[in-house]
């Protein structure tokens, strides 16, 4: 096993532990707590894949971080922080909407890249909106935290989430996954639309008027343009 892979996992485990202690003191905001839960699932998946114990990895990660901090001057730390662009975290869903459990009468699931798509194909003739929490950097979608499909009544009927065991996905991965989800839901005559915020950062405007590059019908309600793959 590559030593960099192991040490990276160890450092991630320790940094998660520090963030958890911070959250235990009720100091974290909603995006912070959301990332904490997502990263916990990711670490469990990576630990299982690598065959490493998380507690042991956390202790080793602490030693690595302490060694780095001993060698790091305050001035070097300031320069490092200043040179790293900070992503923005955009929330279209409340904490309750993100953490709510939901059931599927006719469950369908598909994995595309490192994203898992789930939907209830028992849903028919509904108006559905896709909302997501995600991070943005340089005006581009950086990472999807969670996307869910809601009916007008507020019921959850589908979602796209990163697989904990396969970290990392691209903007194209997200667009492809959204296309699959829309195709599956529209197969049962549901009308699906994507939130304006998600459209703006996933399908960035490319014309001189700043309009979304989606065709008019697709922009309005993301008409059925993709055959269902789920």
UniProtKB/Swiss-Prot annotation:
One of its GO terms (molecular function) is protein serine/threonine kinase inhibitor activity. GO terms for biological process: symbiont-mediated suppression of host cytoplasmic pattern recognition receptor signaling pathway via inhibition of RIG-I activity; symbiont-mediated suppression of host gene expression; symbiont-mediated suppression of host mRNA processing; symbiont-mediated suppression of host PKR/eIFalpha signaling; symbiont-mediated suppression of host type I interferon-mediated signaling pathway. Residues 180-215 are annotated as: CPSF4-binding. Gene3D superfamilies: Influenza virus non-structural protein, effector domain, S15/NS1, RNA-binding. A motif (Nuclear export signal) lies at residues 137-146. Pfam families: Flu_NS1. Residues 1-73 are annotated as: RNA-binding and homodimerization. Residues 223-230 are annotated as: PABPN1-binding. It is found in: Host nucleus; Host cytoplasm. Residues 204-230 are annotated as: Disordered. Keywords: Eukaryotic host gene expression shutoff by virus, Host cytoplasm, Host gene expression shutoff by virus, Host mRNA suppression by virus, Host nucleus, Host-virus interaction, Inhibition of host innate immune response by virus, Inhibition of host interferon signaling pathway by virus, Inhibition of host PKR by virus, Inhibition of host pre-mRNA processing by virus, Inhibition of host RIG-I by virus, Inhibition of host RLR pathway by virus, Interferon antiviral system evasion, RNA-binding, Ubl conjugation, Viral immunoevasion. Upon interferon induction, ISGylated via host HERC5; this results in the impairment of NS1 interaction with RNA targets due to its inability to form homodimers and to interact with host EIF2AK2/PKR. One of its GO terms (cellular component) is host cell cytoplasm. A motif (Nuclear localization signal) lies at residues 34-38. Homodimer. Interacts with host TRIM25 (via coiled coil); this interaction specifically inhibits TRIM25 multimerization and TRIM25-mediated RIGI CARD ubiquitination. Interacts with human EIF2AK2/PKR, CPSF4, IVNS1ABP and PABPN1. Belongs to the influenza A viruses NS1 family. The dsRNA-binding region is required for suppression of RNA silencing. Inhibits post-transcriptional processing of cellular pre-mRNA, by binding and inhibiting two cellular proteins that are required for the 3'-end processing of cellular pre-mRNAs: the 30 kDa cleavage and polyadenylation specificity factor/CPSF4 and the poly(A)-binding protein 2/PABPN1. In turn, unprocessed 3' end pre-mRNAs accumulate in the host nucleus and are no longer exported to the cytoplasm. Cellular protein synthesis is thereby shut off very early after virus infection. This is Non-structural protein 1. It comes from Influenza A virus (strain A/Hong Kong/156/1997 H5N1 genotype Gs/Gd). The lineage of its organism: Viruses, Riboviria, Orthornavirae, Negarnaviricota, Polyploviricotina.
């Amino acid at each position: 096993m590559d030593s960099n892979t192991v040490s990276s996992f160890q450092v991630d485990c320790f940094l998660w532990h520090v963030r958890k202690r911070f959250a235990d003191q009720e100091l974290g905001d909603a995006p912070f707590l959301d990332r904490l839960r997502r990263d916990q699932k990711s670490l469990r998946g990576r630990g299982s894949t690598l065959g490493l114990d998380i507690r042991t990895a956390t202790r080793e990660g602490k030693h690595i971080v302490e060694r780095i901090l001993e060698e790091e001057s305050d001035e070097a730390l300031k320069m490092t922080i200043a040179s790293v662009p900070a992503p923005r975290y955009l929330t279209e869903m409340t904490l309750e909407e993100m953490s709510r459990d939901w059931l599927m009468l006719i469950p369908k699931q598909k994995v595309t890249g490192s994203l898992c798509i789930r939907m209830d194909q028992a849903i028919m003739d509904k108006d559905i909106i896709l909302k997501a929490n995600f991070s943005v950097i340089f005006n581009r979608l950086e990472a999807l935290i969670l996307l869910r499909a809601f009916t007008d009544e507020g019921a959850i009927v589908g979602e796209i989430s990163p697989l904990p065991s396969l970290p990392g996905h691209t903007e194209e991965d997200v667009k492809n996954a959204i296309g699959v989800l829309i195709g599956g839901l529209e197969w049962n005559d549901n009308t699906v639309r994507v939130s304006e915020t998600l459209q703006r950062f996933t399908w960035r405007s490319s014309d001189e008027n700043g309009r979304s590059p989606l065709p008019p019908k697709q922009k309005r309600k993301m008409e059925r343009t993709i055959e269902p793959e789920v």
